[in-house]
């Protein structure tokens, strides 16, 4: 009953998001998800409950893109799953289905152009479903709801908890111990945190490689020394690797389990991200006959200090944009009133 008391007028998630209003049976309202299911020969109205206990979550906890760059109210999101659920398969969808008009990227999809490296970029949303589906639990048929909405009893009735949160919030880890009954809560918590710690540390490594790659491309674009005959092609290769490397990093960063939904996939994706970012650096170095190499030596946090504070409001302040070397590539935004605070509308 938490939903009935905590959902505000501005919150778009309610009972009807997952339940038929008359029967309270699970049902899908997401047209993009239904489109995908139909494309693989499944009837959204005739799926088993075991599958529905994850698909209702996949209505939102997924990666998606809009099928029109206008992103207007008549446009609709598309789930990029036609080639599979891996980062590589999703990336292949973004190799077309867009309107980028830049040498080497014509017709590709991009969410924005990075102001520093001038690279058409991809922003992952929250690919929880795509990460979980071929992980240990997903492959074993464990549904999202089994862990995040475990059964409980209220007044003698069995029902699913609607406190949507991490199972780690429960000191007893009862959701986990429904299956892992032979393990203590302390042991299970330790295994989860071990995976998350390894993933997070690798995420930070991949992040630094990505920043260095953007900086390498920036330096190569502004390089005025002697350049090789294939300079333009090397710049395209560098940008392509920056774009893909950051997307792979973001696939793990934007996902909510810090690797736990699929430890092998998370670490493999981050390894690929690091390799791609290094490929970008190598291409940028070649494009300048290694003339920029001295400027890329050392701790990347010293070369490009971490941006610890940034917001739309701060970008409206020209003086603040003087506080970081990368901010020089941003245009000050026009003054505007703040409309939202988190998920609460304030005006």
Features from the language model and the residues they span:
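Extended, compositionally biased alpha-helical segments that mediate assembly or anchoring
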Residues: 338-347
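Primarily the internal scaffold of c-type cytochrome electron-transfer domains
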Residues: 2-146, 150-336
């Amino acid at each position: 009953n938490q939903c009935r008391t905590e959902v505000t007028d501005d919150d778009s998630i309610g009972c009807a998001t997952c339940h038929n209003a008359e029967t309270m049976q699970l049902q899908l309202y997401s047209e993009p998800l239904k489109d995908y299911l139909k494309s693989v020969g499944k009837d959204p109205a005739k799926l088993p409950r075991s599958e529905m206990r994850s698909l209702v979550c996949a209505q939102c906890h997924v990666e998606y893109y809009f099928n029109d760059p206008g992103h207007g109210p008549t446009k609709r999101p598309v789930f990029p799953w036609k080639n599979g659920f891996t980062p590589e398969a999703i990336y292949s969808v973004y190799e077309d289905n867009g309107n980028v008009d830049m040498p080497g990227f014509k017709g590709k999809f991009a969410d924005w152009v990075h102001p520093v490296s001038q690279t058409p970029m991809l922003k992952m949303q929250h690919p929880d479903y795509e990460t979980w589906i071929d992980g240990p639990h997903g492959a074993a048929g464990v549904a999202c709801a089994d862990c995040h909405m475990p059964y409980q009893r209220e007044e003698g009735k069995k029902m699913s908890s609607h406190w949507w949160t991490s199972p780690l919030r429960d000191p007893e880890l009862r959701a986990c111990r429904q299956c892992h009954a032979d393990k203590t809560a302390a042991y299970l918590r330790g295994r989860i945190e071990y995976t998350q710690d390894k993933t997070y540390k690798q995420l930070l490594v991949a992040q630094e490689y990505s920043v260095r790659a953007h900086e390498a491309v920036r330096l190569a674009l502004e390089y005025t020394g002697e350049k090789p005959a294939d300079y333009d092609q090397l710049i395209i290769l560098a940008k392509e690797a920056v774009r893909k490397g950051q997307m792979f990093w973001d696939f793990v960063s934007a996902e909510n389990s810090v690797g736990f939904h699929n430890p092998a996939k998370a670490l493999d994706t981050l390894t690929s991200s690091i390799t791609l970012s290094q490929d970008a650096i190598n291409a940028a170095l070649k494009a300048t006959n290694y003339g920029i190499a001295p400027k890329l030596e050392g701790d990347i946090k010293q070369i490009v200090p971490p941006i610890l504070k940034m917001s739309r409001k701060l970008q409206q302040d020209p003086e603040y944009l003087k506080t970081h070397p990368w901010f020089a590539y941003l245009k000050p935004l026009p003054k505007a009133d703040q409309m939202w605070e988190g998920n609460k509308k304030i005006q």
